[in-house]
From Swiss-Prot:
Known role: Component of the phosphoenolpyruvate-dependent nitrogen-metabolic phosphotransferase system (nitrogen-metabolic PTS), that seems to be involved in regulating nitrogen metabolism. The phosphoryl group from phosphoenolpyruvate (PEP) is transferred to the phosphoryl carrier protein NPr by enzyme I-Ntr. Phospho-NPr then transfers it to EIIA-Ntr. Could function in the transcriptional regulation of sigma-54 dependent operons in conjunction with the NPr (PtsO) and EIIA-Ntr (PtsN) proteins.
Domain HPr span(s) in chain numbering: 3-90
Location(s), subcellular: Cytoplasm
Residues at the catalytic site: 17 (pros-phosphohistidine intermediate)
GO BP term (any one): phosphoenolpyruvate-dependent sugar phosphotransferase system
Organism: Shewanella violacea (strain JCM 10179 / CIP 106290 / LMG 19151 / DSS12)
Protein known as: Phosphocarrier protein NPr
One Pfam family, short name: PTS-HPr
GO cellular component: cytoplasm
Keyword terms, alphabetized: Cytoplasm, Phosphotransferase system
Family label: Belongs to the HPr family.
């Protein structure tokens, strides 16, 4: 099974805070794929809100998305779009 990788920069003011992490985890869970988020030396499942919060990812940080599974490409596209849309937050 091919592993896919993408990088995206967190651009919303509050970074990957609780509400944003929840949106990301819900989105990741919709796909038949295992998605891992990496920031520096830390890794977390994209489906784990607590794991995502433990990454302590702030505005301007670049994260790496690793995906494997049947829907990995679509999942990475959707997650990148969510991050680029600043998690649909006003600011």
């Amino acid at each position: 099974m091919t592993k896919l990788e993408r990088q995206v920069t967190i651009c919303n003011k509050l970074g990957l805070h609780a509400r944003a992490a929840t949106k990301l985890a819900i989105l990741a869970s919709e796909f038949d794929a295992e998605i891992t988020i990496v920031q520096g030396e830390k890794k977390a499942s994209a489906a784990s809100v607590l794991g995502l919060l433990m990454l302590e990812t702030g505005m301007g940080k670049t994260i790496t998305l690793l995906g494997k599974g049947q829907d990995a490409d679509a999942a990475l596209d959707a997650i990148c779009a969510l991050v680029d849309a600043k998690f649909d937050e006003a600011s």
